[in-house]
Swiss-Prot record:
Broad EC category: oxidoreductase
Known function: Catalyzes the NADPH-dependent reduction of L-glutamate 5-phosphate into L-glutamate 5-semialdehyde and phosphate. The product spontaneously undergoes cyclization to form 1-pyrroline-5-carboxylate.
Location (main, coarse): cytoplasm
Originating organism: Magnetococcus marinus (strain ATCC BAA-1437 / JCM 17883 / MC-1)
Alphabetized SUPFAM superfamilies for the sequence: ALDH-like
EC numbers on record: 1.2.1.41
Annotated family: Belongs to the gamma-glutamyl phosphate reductase family.
Cysteine disulfide partners in this protein: none
Protein name as it appears in the record: Gamma-glutamyl phosphate reductase
Catalytic activity: L-glutamate 5-semialdehyde + phosphate + NADP(+) = L-glutamyl 5-phosphate + NADPH + H(+)
Amino acid sequence: MSNDSIKLIDEIGKKARKAARQLAWLDSGSKNATLHAMADALIACKKILQVENEKDLEAGEKNGLTDAMLDRLRLTDQVIASMAEGIRQVAALPDPIGEINHMRRLANQLQVGKMRVPLGVIGIIYESRPNVTADAAALCVKSGNAVILRGGSEAFHSNRAIAAALAQGMEKGRVPSDAVQVVSTTDRAAVSALLKADQYVDIIIPRGGKGLIQRVMDEATIPVIKHLDGICHTYIDADADPAKAIDITFNGKMQRTGVCNATETLLIHEKVAKTILPALAKRLNQADCVLRGCPETIRLVGEVAPVIPATEEDWDTEYLAAILAIRVVKNLEEAMDHIDAHSSRHTEVIVTENHATAMRFVREVDASAVMVNASSRFNDGFQFGLGAEMGISTDKLHVRGPVGLEGLTCEKWIVLGDGQLRS
């Protein structure tokens, strides 16, 4: 790790810690006004953003980035307008800071409760999408946190330009400009330095591919909020409505394949597999979805659609593509055993009209979200009514599921007395 990287992160960390203290108890009106000013600044700086973005696009083409990656990188007029609107939507969300819950009076007349407060300084490490810079900044400002952003080198110029525009907006409000800082180097050693800056940073949130998240897990000396994989299952029960089962599975797999809440494995009860699988396989095949199935799946689907024999590796694979692994199971217990053995604890779905079966699945299956008769694709902050999110956590500490504003806060105990002494 280079001394320059350590020095850079040390300087940024000190500024962020000071800004976090100033921001922590800024009133909601001031934060919201600042967020609107930040959104306005993005629109006002559109031409500058696109000039800087073009540098990243040209470098990306030279470095062989795929068309899909270049598309995610590109800051069109629509993308910039969407970023600004996203900031305004965050401003419209309820402010969780200062909420007091569970306040009660004890026998000795002490009043004891919990107050919601910011985490402090959040480090966010992410890849490709420069819009994350604006999204993360907005969520952190609203939740009273300072943020240190380290985007991918492929979006280096874009991220710096977005941060500079946001700083112009913050200058018009009461939010200290150091509350949002970008690590202004492509040196990978700076990532290592940030992951070990526990004297300044309270939480690390990685957003990106498995390689990035694994590196963060291996190197960080700071608590991490993350999900490593999205191996999500849909289980079609013996008491499932066939039409619902087909629609829910198809939507979970095909509505958008390259995301963490897409269904990767279908489990189906043997009693309904004969009637549901052929129709489902035909529909998936027509949508160019590759099927990988157990021997019973291959037998039941027959000539309706091609099915590749599944291997043990398939049950542990997050495809992020139009590929679905299928296994026929004898009962609910076998389905839950399979999920327990292979799930990434992200999103699990049951399709059934049997309430008792559904409630048992909800109680016993371990995941950040369990769906009954609904697509796995609904595990999302916007879909849950939380507004913007920082990602979806499969951890059990400190937050689980979509990480919205409340997930970027914690609680502290408050005690109100009138001279009470402990005997």
